[in-house]
Amino acid sequence: MADTDEGFGLARTPLEPDSKDRSCDSKPESALGAPSKSPSSPQAAFTQQGMEGIKVFLHERELWLKFHEVGTEMIITKAGRRMFPSYKVKVTGLNPKTKYILLMDIVPADDHRYKFADNKWSVTGKAEPAMPGRLYVHPDSPATGAHWMRQLVSFQKLKLTNNHLDPFGHIILNSMHKYQPRLHIVKADENNGFGSKNTAFCTHVFPETAFIAVTSYQNHKITQLKIENNPFAKGFRGSDDLELHRMSRMQSKEYPVVPRSTVRHKVTSNHSPFSSETRALSTSSNLGSQYQCENGVSGPSQDLLPPPNPYPLAQEHSQIYHCTKRKDEECSSTEHPYKKPYMETSPSEEDTFYRSGYPQQQGLSTSYRTESAQRQACMYASSAPPSEPVPSLEDISCNTWPSMPSYSSCTVTTVQPMDRLPYQHFSAHFTSGPLVPRLAGMANHGSPQLGEGMFQHQTSVAHQPVVRQCGPQTGLQSPGGLQPPEFLYTHGVPRTLSPHQYHSVHGVGMVPEWSENS
Protein backbone atom coordinates (compact mmCIF):
# COMPACT_ATOMS: atom_id res chain seq x y z
CA MET A 1 0.00 0.00 0.00
CA ALA A 2 2.95 2.27 0.58
CA ASP A 3 4.07 1.87 -3.01
CA THR A 4 0.63 2.93 -4.17
CA ASP A 5 0.72 6.00 -1.97
CA GLU A 6 4.18 7.00 -3.14
CA GLY A 7 3.18 6.54 -6.74
CA PHE A 8 0.32 8.97 -6.19
CA GLY A 9 2.67 11.46 -4.55
CA LEU A 10 0.93 11.65 -1.19
CA ALA A 11 3.17 9.31 0.87
CA ARG A 12 3.55 11.95 3.58
CA THR A 13 -0.09 12.85 3.70
CA PRO A 14 -1.22 10.24 6.23
CA LEU A 15 1.40 11.51 8.69
CA GLU A 16 -0.31 14.87 8.98
CA PRO A 17 -3.22 14.99 11.39
CA ASP A 18 -5.37 17.32 9.22
CA SER A 19 -4.95 15.21 6.12
CA LYS A 20 -5.35 11.82 7.71
CA ASP A 21 -6.98 9.42 5.30
CA ARG A 22 -10.55 8.49 6.04
CA SER A 23 -10.35 4.76 6.65
CA CYS A 24 -13.28 2.48 7.29
CA ASP A 25 -13.43 1.79 11.00
CA SER A 26 -15.86 1.90 13.89
CA LYS A 27 -14.79 5.32 15.20
CA PRO A 28 -17.46 7.99 15.60
CA GLU A 29 -17.73 10.33 12.66
CA SER A 30 -17.02 13.32 14.84
CA ALA A 31 -13.47 12.08 15.10
CA LEU A 32 -13.27 12.16 11.30
CA GLY A 33 -13.93 15.89 11.20
CA ALA A 34 -17.66 15.88 10.42
CA PRO A 35 -19.91 18.00 12.65
CA SER A 36 -21.19 15.84 15.43
CA LYS A 37 -24.30 18.01 15.90
CA SER A 38 -25.52 17.50 12.36
CA PRO A 39 -28.85 15.65 12.51
CA SER A 40 -28.36 14.05 9.11
CA SER A 41 -24.84 12.79 9.72
CA PRO A 42 -24.47 9.20 10.80
CA GLN A 43 -23.12 8.89 14.27
CA ALA A 44 -20.75 6.12 13.28
CA ALA A 45 -19.20 4.64 10.19
CA PHE A 46 -19.43 0.92 10.36
CA THR A 47 -17.01 -1.53 8.90
CA GLN A 48 -17.57 -5.17 8.13
CA GLN A 49 -15.42 -8.02 7.02
CA GLY A 50 -13.59 -7.27 3.83
CA MET A 51 -13.77 -3.44 4.27
CA GLU A 52 -10.80 -3.01 6.58
CA GLY A 53 -7.78 -1.09 5.40
CA ILE A 54 -9.55 0.97 2.73
CA LYS A 55 -8.00 4.44 2.49
CA VAL A 56 -9.17 7.48 0.50
CA PHE A 57 -7.12 10.57 -0.35
CA LEU A 58 -8.61 13.84 -1.58
CA HIS A 59 -7.16 15.06 -4.86
CA GLU A 60 -6.04 18.71 -5.05
CA ARG A 61 -6.42 19.12 -1.33
CA GLU A 62 -4.34 22.32 -1.38
CA LEU A 63 -6.83 23.95 -3.73
CA TRP A 64 -9.72 22.87 -1.56
CA LEU A 65 -7.99 24.40 1.45
CA LYS A 66 -7.63 27.76 -0.36
CA PHE A 67 -11.37 27.88 -0.90
CA HIS A 68 -12.11 26.58 2.58
CA GLU A 69 -10.11 29.37 4.23
CA VAL A 70 -12.17 32.02 2.42
CA GLY A 71 -15.47 30.15 2.61
CA THR A 72 -16.25 27.83 -0.30
CA GLU A 73 -19.32 28.68 -2.36
CA MET A 74 -20.97 26.47 -4.96
CA ILE A 75 -23.38 27.77 -7.58
CA ILE A 76 -26.75 26.02 -7.87
CA THR A 77 -29.07 26.56 -10.83
CA LYS A 78 -32.36 25.17 -12.02
CA ALA A 79 -30.67 23.26 -14.85
CA GLY A 80 -27.85 22.06 -12.60
CA ARG A 81 -24.27 23.25 -12.15
CA ARG A 82 -21.08 21.26 -11.67
CA MET A 83 -18.87 21.71 -8.64
CA PHE A 84 -15.53 23.43 -8.68
CA PRO A 85 -13.13 22.30 -7.37
CA SER A 86 -14.22 18.91 -8.64
CA TYR A 87 -14.55 16.09 -6.16
CA LYS A 88 -11.79 13.61 -7.04
CA VAL A 89 -10.30 10.96 -4.78
CA LYS A 90 -7.64 8.28 -4.81
CA VAL A 91 -8.79 4.97 -3.32
CA THR A 92 -6.49 2.23 -2.00
CA GLY A 93 -6.92 -1.00 -0.02
CA LEU A 94 -9.70 -2.52 -2.13
CA ASN A 95 -9.84 -6.19 -3.08
CA PRO A 96 -8.78 -6.20 -6.73
CA LYS A 97 -11.33 -8.90 -7.66
CA THR A 98 -14.25 -7.73 -5.59
CA LYS A 99 -16.82 -5.43 -7.16
CA TYR A 100 -17.55 -2.14 -5.44
CA ILE A 101 -20.05 0.67 -5.92
CA LEU A 102 -18.87 4.23 -5.30
CA LEU A 103 -21.46 6.91 -4.66
CA MET A 104 -21.81 10.36 -3.14
CA ASP A 105 -24.38 12.31 -1.26
CA ILE A 106 -24.43 15.87 0.08
CA VAL A 107 -25.97 16.43 3.47
CA PRO A 108 -26.59 19.61 5.50
CA ALA A 109 -23.59 20.56 7.61
CA ASP A 110 -25.76 22.28 10.24
CA ASP A 111 -29.28 23.57 10.79
CA HIS A 112 -28.64 27.25 10.04
CA ARG A 113 -29.34 29.63 7.22
CA TYR A 114 -26.55 32.03 6.28
CA LYS A 115 -26.16 35.48 4.79
CA PHE A 116 -23.11 37.34 3.49
CA ALA A 117 -22.75 40.82 4.95
CA ASP A 118 -19.79 43.03 5.86
CA ASN A 119 -17.53 40.77 3.80
CA LYS A 120 -18.23 37.73 5.95
CA TRP A 121 -20.75 34.94 6.42
CA SER A 122 -23.07 35.01 9.41
CA VAL A 123 -26.05 33.02 10.64
CA THR A 124 -29.36 34.64 9.77
CA GLY A 125 -31.89 32.07 10.91
CA LYS A 126 -32.95 28.48 11.05
CA ALA A 127 -32.42 26.22 8.08
CA GLU A 128 -35.27 25.28 5.80
CA PRO A 129 -36.47 21.69 5.88
CA ALA A 130 -33.98 19.50 4.08
CA MET A 131 -35.03 17.87 0.87
CA PRO A 132 -34.99 14.08 0.66
CA GLY A 133 -31.38 13.11 0.13
CA ARG A 134 -30.31 11.92 -3.27
CA LEU A 135 -27.40 9.65 -4.03
CA TYR A 136 -25.13 10.16 -7.01
CA VAL A 137 -23.75 6.81 -8.15
CA HIS A 138 -20.49 6.92 -10.08
CA PRO A 139 -21.08 5.97 -13.73
CA ASP A 140 -18.44 3.21 -13.59
CA SER A 141 -20.22 1.37 -10.80
CA PRO A 142 -20.12 -1.49 -10.20
CA ALA A 143 -16.48 -2.18 -10.93
CA THR A 144 -13.70 -4.26 -9.48
CA GLY A 145 -11.31 -2.96 -6.89
CA ALA A 146 -8.53 -3.08 -9.46
CA HIS A 147 -10.50 -0.67 -11.67
CA TRP A 148 -11.08 1.85 -8.88
CA MET A 149 -7.50 1.78 -7.68
CA ARG A 150 -6.02 2.12 -11.17
CA GLN A 151 -6.78 5.83 -11.51
CA LEU A 152 -8.45 8.80 -9.86
CA VAL A 153 -12.13 8.47 -9.11
CA SER A 154 -13.75 11.67 -10.37
CA PHE A 155 -17.23 12.93 -9.56
CA GLN A 156 -16.94 15.97 -11.81
CA LYS A 157 -20.21 15.17 -13.61
CA LEU A 158 -22.20 15.61 -10.43
CA LYS A 159 -24.50 18.63 -10.66
CA LEU A 160 -26.18 20.77 -8.03
CA THR A 161 -29.66 22.22 -8.52
CA ASN A 162 -32.26 24.22 -6.61
CA ASN A 163 -35.15 22.72 -8.57
CA HIS A 164 -37.13 20.63 -6.12
CA LEU A 165 -38.85 18.87 -9.03
CA ASP A 166 -35.64 18.05 -10.86
CA PRO A 167 -36.13 14.92 -13.00
CA PHE A 168 -32.48 14.42 -13.98
CA GLY A 169 -31.09 13.02 -10.74
CA HIS A 170 -29.14 16.13 -9.75
CA ILE A 171 -28.45 16.81 -6.08
CA ILE A 172 -31.17 19.16 -4.76
CA LEU A 173 -29.94 21.88 -2.37
CA ASN A 174 -31.27 25.06 -0.79
CA SER A 175 -29.55 28.37 -1.37
CA MET A 176 -27.67 30.01 1.54
CA HIS A 177 -27.30 26.70 3.36
CA LYS A 178 -24.10 24.90 4.30
CA TYR A 179 -23.53 21.37 3.03
CA GLN A 180 -20.99 18.56 3.45
CA PRO A 181 -20.20 16.09 0.63
CA ARG A 182 -19.70 12.45 1.61
CA LEU A 183 -18.17 9.50 -0.24
CA HIS A 184 -19.57 5.99 0.23
CA ILE A 185 -17.83 2.79 -0.84
CA VAL A 186 -20.25 -0.13 -0.98
CA LYS A 187 -19.43 -3.75 -1.70
CA ALA A 188 -21.75 -5.01 -4.41
CA ASP A 189 -23.93 -8.00 -3.61
CA GLU A 190 -24.58 -11.01 -5.76
CA ASN A 191 -26.98 -8.95 -7.88
CA ASN A 192 -24.39 -6.15 -8.36
CA GLY A 193 -26.54 -3.93 -6.17
CA PHE A 194 -26.73 -2.65 -2.64
CA GLY A 195 -29.31 -1.95 0.00
CA SER A 196 -29.70 -5.28 1.70
CA LYS A 197 -29.04 -5.82 5.40
CA ASN A 198 -25.73 -7.51 4.89
CA THR A 199 -24.31 -4.86 2.55
CA ALA A 200 -20.81 -3.81 3.64
CA PHE A 201 -19.95 -0.15 3.22
CA CYS A 202 -17.82 2.67 4.62
CA THR A 203 -18.18 6.46 4.51
CA HIS A 204 -15.44 9.06 4.07
CA VAL A 205 -15.81 12.75 4.88
CA PHE A 206 -13.39 15.59 4.12
CA PRO A 207 -14.23 18.73 6.14
CA GLU A 208 -12.39 21.02 3.69
CA THR A 209 -14.96 20.15 1.02
CA ALA A 210 -17.85 21.77 2.91
CA PHE A 211 -19.49 24.67 1.06
CA ILE A 212 -22.41 27.09 1.07
CA ALA A 213 -24.86 26.81 -1.82
CA VAL A 214 -25.56 30.13 -3.57
CA THR A 215 -27.27 31.25 -6.75
CA SER A 216 -24.53 33.83 -7.38
CA TYR A 217 -21.14 34.31 -5.81
CA GLN A 218 -21.25 36.53 -2.73
CA ASN A 219 -17.56 36.84 -1.88
CA HIS A 220 -15.43 38.43 -4.59
CA LYS A 221 -12.43 36.45 -3.33
CA ILE A 222 -14.20 33.23 -4.25
CA THR A 223 -14.93 34.67 -7.67
CA GLN A 224 -11.28 35.50 -8.14
CA LEU A 225 -10.20 32.02 -7.06
CA LYS A 226 -12.63 30.43 -9.51
CA ILE A 227 -11.33 32.60 -12.34
CA GLU A 228 -7.71 31.86 -11.57
CA ASN A 229 -8.12 28.10 -11.25
CA ASN A 230 -11.11 27.13 -13.39
CA PRO A 231 -10.46 27.35 -17.15
CA PHE A 232 -14.21 27.05 -17.79
CA ALA A 233 -15.20 30.02 -15.60
CA LYS A 234 -15.48 32.40 -18.58
CA GLY A 235 -18.99 33.42 -17.60
CA PHE A 236 -17.70 35.28 -14.54
CA ARG A 237 -14.78 37.01 -16.22
CA GLY A 238 -16.88 39.63 -17.98
CA SER A 239 -17.89 41.23 -14.66
CA ASP A 240 -14.45 41.09 -13.11
CA ASP A 241 -12.62 44.38 -12.71
CA LEU A 242 -9.33 42.89 -13.83
CA GLU A 243 -10.95 41.42 -16.91
CA LEU A 244 -12.65 44.69 -17.78
CA HIS A 245 -9.32 46.46 -17.48
CA ARG A 246 -7.71 43.89 -19.75
CA MET A 247 -10.47 44.21 -22.35
CA SER A 248 -10.25 48.00 -22.37
CA ARG A 249 -6.49 47.83 -22.81
CA MET A 250 -6.88 45.40 -25.69
CA GLN A 251 -9.43 47.64 -27.42
CA SER A 252 -7.23 50.72 -27.06
CA LYS A 253 -4.04 49.11 -28.37
CA GLU A 254 -4.80 46.11 -30.54
CA TYR A 255 -8.12 47.33 -31.99
CA PRO A 256 -8.05 51.13 -32.10
CA VAL A 257 -11.29 52.92 -32.85
CA VAL A 258 -10.89 55.47 -35.64
CA PRO A 259 -12.72 58.75 -34.92
CA ARG A 260 -15.42 59.75 -37.38
CA SER A 261 -13.90 63.17 -38.00
CA THR A 262 -10.59 61.66 -39.06
CA VAL A 263 -12.20 59.38 -41.61
CA ARG A 264 -14.39 62.12 -43.03
CA HIS A 265 -11.41 64.43 -43.37
CA LYS A 266 -9.58 61.81 -45.38
CA VAL A 267 -12.62 61.25 -47.57
CA THR A 268 -12.97 64.90 -48.50
CA SER A 269 -9.25 65.39 -49.07
CA ASN A 270 -8.93 62.75 -51.80
CA HIS A 271 -7.31 64.03 -54.99
CA SER A 272 -9.69 64.86 -57.81
CA PRO A 273 -9.35 66.96 -60.98
CA PHE A 274 -12.40 68.93 -59.79
CA SER A 275 -11.09 69.59 -56.28
CA SER A 276 -10.29 73.25 -57.11
CA GLU A 277 -13.90 74.09 -57.81
CA THR A 278 -16.19 71.25 -56.76
CA ARG A 279 -16.45 68.65 -54.05
CA ALA A 280 -18.07 65.36 -54.99
CA LEU A 281 -20.48 63.86 -52.52
CA SER A 282 -19.22 60.28 -52.24
CA THR A 283 -22.01 58.50 -50.42
CA SER A 284 -20.26 55.14 -50.46
CA SER A 285 -17.22 56.58 -48.71
CA ASN A 286 -19.29 58.06 -45.91
CA LEU A 287 -21.09 54.79 -45.37
CA GLY A 288 -17.82 52.93 -45.21
CA SER A 289 -16.46 55.32 -42.62
CA GLN A 290 -19.51 54.87 -40.42
CA TYR A 291 -19.20 51.11 -40.42
CA GLN A 292 -15.51 51.42 -39.71
CA CYS A 293 -16.03 53.64 -36.69
CA GLU A 294 -18.84 51.61 -35.24
CA ASN A 295 -17.19 48.30 -35.67
CA GLY A 296 -13.76 49.38 -34.47
CA VAL A 297 -11.89 47.88 -37.40
CA SER A 298 -8.17 48.45 -37.24
CA GLY A 299 -5.92 49.56 -40.03
CA PRO A 300 -5.70 52.68 -42.14
CA SER A 301 -9.00 54.08 -43.22
CA GLN A 302 -7.84 54.62 -46.78
CA ASP A 303 -7.84 50.87 -47.37
CA LEU A 304 -11.62 50.81 -46.98
CA LEU A 305 -12.24 53.89 -49.12
CA PRO A 306 -12.57 53.81 -52.92
CA PRO A 307 -9.51 55.00 -54.86
CA PRO A 308 -9.58 58.54 -56.23
CA ASN A 309 -11.27 58.64 -59.61
CA PRO A 310 -9.88 61.21 -62.08
CA TYR A 311 -13.07 61.01 -64.16
CA PRO A 312 -16.70 61.64 -63.31
CA LEU A 313 -18.84 58.63 -62.52
CA ALA A 314 -20.17 57.70 -65.91
CA GLN A 315 -22.57 55.01 -64.69
CA GLU A 316 -24.74 57.51 -62.80
CA HIS A 317 -27.55 59.22 -64.68
CA SER A 318 -27.23 62.40 -62.65
CA GLN A 319 -23.97 63.79 -61.37
CA ILE A 320 -24.10 65.56 -58.02
CA TYR A 321 -21.77 68.46 -57.42
CA HIS A 322 -21.59 71.43 -55.09
CA CYS A 323 -20.13 74.39 -56.95
CA THR A 324 -18.55 77.13 -54.91
CA LYS A 325 -18.82 80.81 -55.80
CA ARG A 326 -15.64 82.51 -56.89
CA LYS A 327 -14.68 86.01 -57.92
CA ASP A 328 -14.20 87.04 -61.55
CA GLU A 329 -10.55 87.94 -61.15
CA GLU A 330 -9.81 84.52 -59.63
CA CYS A 331 -11.49 82.60 -62.40
CA SER A 332 -10.32 81.97 -65.93
CA SER A 333 -11.61 79.84 -68.73
CA THR A 334 -8.75 77.40 -68.34
CA GLU A 335 -9.71 76.62 -64.73
CA HIS A 336 -13.09 75.21 -65.68
CA PRO A 337 -12.67 71.54 -66.47
CA TYR A 338 -16.19 71.44 -67.88
CA LYS A 339 -15.81 74.30 -70.38
CA LYS A 340 -12.38 73.48 -71.66
CA PRO A 341 -13.07 70.10 -73.30
CA TYR A 342 -16.01 71.54 -75.27
CA MET A 343 -14.02 74.35 -76.87
CA GLU A 344 -10.43 73.17 -77.10
CA THR A 345 -10.38 69.39 -77.33
CA SER A 346 -11.76 67.03 -79.88
CA PRO A 347 -14.51 64.55 -79.09
CA SER A 348 -12.14 61.61 -79.51
CA GLU A 349 -9.73 62.85 -76.85
CA GLU A 350 -12.36 63.62 -74.21
CA ASP A 351 -14.62 60.72 -75.06
CA THR A 352 -14.61 59.34 -71.55
CA PHE A 353 -15.85 62.63 -70.10
CA TYR A 354 -18.94 63.11 -72.20
CA ARG A 355 -19.94 59.69 -73.45
CA SER A 356 -22.97 58.11 -71.89
CA GLY A 357 -22.09 55.66 -69.15
CA TYR A 358 -24.71 53.09 -70.20
CA PRO A 359 -24.76 51.70 -73.76
CA GLN A 360 -27.79 52.16 -75.93
CA GLN A 361 -29.56 48.98 -76.83
CA GLN A 362 -28.97 48.13 -80.45
CA GLY A 363 -32.54 46.96 -80.93
CA LEU A 364 -33.99 50.42 -80.26
CA SER A 365 -34.93 52.61 -83.19
CA THR A 366 -33.62 56.10 -83.75
CA SER A 367 -36.93 57.70 -82.92
CA TYR A 368 -37.03 55.95 -79.54
CA ARG A 369 -33.54 57.17 -78.74
CA THR A 370 -34.36 60.73 -79.69
CA GLU A 371 -37.55 60.63 -77.60
CA SER A 372 -35.65 59.38 -74.54
CA ALA A 373 -32.99 62.02 -75.12
CA GLN A 374 -35.67 64.70 -75.40
CA ARG A 375 -37.22 63.56 -72.13
CA GLN A 376 -33.79 63.55 -70.47
CA ALA A 377 -33.21 67.08 -71.68
CA CYS A 378 -36.58 68.15 -70.34
CA MET A 379 -35.68 66.66 -66.96
CA TYR A 380 -32.93 69.25 -66.64
CA ALA A 381 -35.19 72.11 -67.71
CA SER A 382 -34.73 75.25 -65.68
CA SER A 383 -37.34 77.37 -64.02
CA ALA A 384 -35.97 80.75 -65.15
CA PRO A 385 -38.45 83.32 -66.59
CA PRO A 386 -38.93 83.13 -70.40
CA SER A 387 -37.92 86.75 -70.94
CA GLU A 388 -34.40 86.23 -69.60
CA PRO A 389 -31.91 86.19 -72.50
CA VAL A 390 -29.60 83.23 -72.84
CA PRO A 391 -25.94 84.23 -72.58
CA SER A 392 -23.69 83.59 -75.51
CA LEU A 393 -20.56 81.50 -75.36
CA GLU A 394 -18.30 84.53 -75.00
CA ASP A 395 -20.37 85.91 -72.10
CA ILE A 396 -20.02 82.82 -69.92
CA SER A 397 -17.91 83.67 -66.91
CA CYS A 398 -17.73 82.86 -63.25
CA ASN A 399 -20.55 85.30 -62.50
CA THR A 400 -23.01 83.28 -64.56
CA TRP A 401 -22.19 80.00 -62.85
CA PRO A 402 -23.83 80.61 -59.47
CA SER A 403 -26.72 82.49 -61.10
CA MET A 404 -27.89 79.50 -63.10
CA PRO A 405 -30.99 77.71 -61.71
CA SER A 406 -30.49 74.35 -60.04
CA TYR A 407 -32.19 70.98 -60.36
CA SER A 408 -32.53 68.86 -57.21
CA SER A 409 -30.38 71.40 -55.34
CA CYS A 410 -27.40 70.55 -57.57
CA THR A 411 -26.10 73.16 -60.01
CA VAL A 412 -25.68 71.96 -63.59
CA THR A 413 -22.38 73.40 -64.67
CA THR A 414 -22.38 72.47 -68.35
CA VAL A 415 -24.44 75.32 -69.83
CA GLN A 416 -24.38 75.76 -73.57
CA PRO A 417 -25.57 78.76 -75.64
CA MET A 418 -28.82 78.15 -77.41
CA ASP A 419 -30.53 79.61 -80.47
CA ARG A 420 -34.22 80.19 -80.18
CA LEU A 421 -36.40 78.13 -82.49
CA PRO A 422 -40.17 77.83 -82.79
CA TYR A 423 -41.65 75.54 -80.19
CA GLN A 424 -44.16 72.81 -80.85
CA HIS A 425 -46.10 70.61 -78.49
CA PHE A 426 -44.82 67.14 -77.67
CA SER A 427 -47.51 65.54 -79.79
CA ALA A 428 -45.59 66.55 -82.88
CA HIS A 429 -42.52 64.73 -81.61
CA PHE A 430 -44.29 61.43 -81.27
CA THR A 431 -45.53 61.44 -84.88
CA SER A 432 -42.22 62.19 -86.52
CA GLY A 433 -39.56 59.94 -87.98
CA PRO A 434 -35.88 59.96 -87.21
CA LEU A 435 -34.47 63.48 -87.47
CA VAL A 436 -30.94 63.08 -86.14
CA PRO A 437 -29.41 62.28 -89.56
CA ARG A 438 -31.18 65.28 -91.09
CA LEU A 439 -29.97 67.65 -88.35
CA ALA A 440 -26.44 66.35 -88.70
CA GLY A 441 -26.48 66.99 -92.42
CA MET A 442 -27.95 70.42 -92.06
CA ALA A 443 -25.26 71.38 -89.57
CA ASN A 444 -22.71 71.49 -92.36
CA HIS A 445 -24.70 74.21 -94.19
CA GLY A 446 -25.52 76.33 -91.19
CA SER A 447 -28.47 76.57 -88.90
CA PRO A 448 -31.71 76.11 -90.93
CA GLN A 449 -34.81 78.12 -90.25
CA LEU A 450 -37.82 75.90 -89.84
CA GLY A 451 -41.42 76.81 -90.43
CA GLU A 452 -44.20 76.78 -87.93
CA GLY A 453 -45.02 73.18 -88.68
CA MET A 454 -41.43 72.04 -88.44
CA PHE A 455 -39.57 71.04 -85.30
CA GLN A 456 -36.17 69.87 -84.39
CA HIS A 457 -34.87 67.09 -82.14
CA GLN A 458 -31.74 67.21 -80.13
CA THR A 459 -30.06 64.46 -78.18
CA SER A 460 -28.56 64.84 -74.75
CA VAL A 461 -25.33 63.09 -73.94
CA ALA A 462 -24.62 62.07 -70.32
CA HIS A 463 -23.55 64.99 -68.10
CA GLN A 464 -24.64 67.54 -70.84
CA PRO A 465 -28.08 68.73 -69.78
CA VAL A 466 -29.58 71.33 -72.09
CA VAL A 467 -31.22 74.42 -70.63
CA ARG A 468 -34.73 74.69 -71.97
CA GLN A 469 -37.56 77.13 -71.38
CA CYS A 470 -40.75 75.15 -70.85
CA GLY A 471 -43.21 78.01 -71.29
CA PRO A 472 -45.93 77.74 -73.93
CA GLN A 473 -44.52 80.61 -76.06
CA THR A 474 -40.83 79.81 -75.85
CA GLY A 475 -38.87 77.95 -78.46
CA LEU A 476 -36.71 74.89 -78.20
CA GLN A 477 -33.08 75.95 -77.94
CA SER A 478 -30.41 74.18 -79.96
CA PRO A 479 -26.66 74.58 -79.92
CA GLY A 480 -25.19 76.91 -82.48
CA GLY A 481 -21.53 77.54 -81.68
CA LEU A 482 -20.46 73.97 -81.09
CA GLN A 483 -19.23 71.38 -83.50
CA PRO A 484 -22.39 69.61 -84.68
CA PRO A 485 -21.06 66.03 -84.75
CA GLU A 486 -20.11 66.20 -81.07
CA PHE A 487 -23.48 67.31 -79.78
CA LEU A 488 -26.09 65.97 -82.20
CA TYR A 489 -24.91 62.46 -82.80
CA THR A 490 -25.95 59.58 -80.60
CA HIS A 491 -24.02 56.40 -80.16
CA GLY A 492 -26.12 54.41 -82.61
CA VAL A 493 -26.03 56.92 -85.52
CA PRO A 494 -23.22 56.93 -88.11
CA ARG A 495 -21.30 60.19 -88.48
CA THR A 496 -21.06 60.14 -92.28
CA LEU A 497 -24.38 60.50 -94.01
CA SER A 498 -25.28 60.34 -97.65
CA PRO A 499 -26.94 63.37 -99.30
CA HIS A 500 -30.24 61.58 -99.82
CA GLN A 501 -30.72 61.39 -96.04
CA TYR A 502 -30.69 65.15 -95.57
CA HIS A 503 -34.39 65.54 -96.37
CA SER A 504 -35.66 62.33 -94.72
CA VAL A 505 -38.40 64.09 -92.75
CA HIS A 506 -41.69 62.30 -92.29
CA GLY A 507 -43.77 65.22 -91.15
CA VAL A 508 -47.39 65.93 -91.83
CA GLY A 509 -46.99 66.95 -95.44
CA MET A 510 -44.35 69.53 -94.56
CA VAL A 511 -41.44 70.54 -96.82
CA PRO A 512 -38.31 71.99 -95.19
CA GLU A 513 -37.51 75.60 -95.94
CA TRP A 514 -33.88 76.49 -96.41
CA SER A 515 -32.51 79.86 -95.38
CA GLU A 516 -30.22 82.04 -97.43
CA ASN A 517 -27.19 80.86 -95.49
CA SER A 518 -27.72 77.33 -96.74
Swiss-Prot record:
Residues 58-238 bind DNA. DNA-binding protein that regulates the transcription of several genes and is involved in heart development and limb pattern formation. Binds to the core DNA motif of NPPA promoter. The lineage of its organism: Eukaryota, Metazoa, Chordata, Craniata, Vertebrata. The modification N6-acetyllysine is found at K339. It comes from the Eukaryota. PROSITE patterns: TBOX_1, TBOX_2, TBOX_3. This is T-box transcription factor TBX5. One of its GO terms (cellular component) is nucleoplasm. One of its GO terms (molecular function) is DNA binding. Residues 1-46, 254-307, 330-352 are annotated as: Disordered. Acetylation at Lys-339 by KAT2A and KAT2B promotes nuclear retention. Signal peptide: none annotated. Monomer. Homodimer (via the T-box); binds DNA as homodimer. Interacts (via the T-box) with NKX2-5 (via the homeobox); this complex binds DNA. Interacts with GATA4. Interacts with KAT2A and KAT2B. GO terms for biological process: animal organ development; atrial septum development; atrial septum morphogenesis; atrioventricular bundle cell differentiation; atrioventricular node cell development; atrioventricular node cell fate commitment; atrioventricular valve morphogenesis; bundle of His cell to Purkinje myocyte communication by electrical coupling. It is found in: Nucleus; Cytoplasm. PANTHER family: T-BOX PROTEIN-RELATED, T-BOX TRANSCRIPTION FACTOR TBX5.
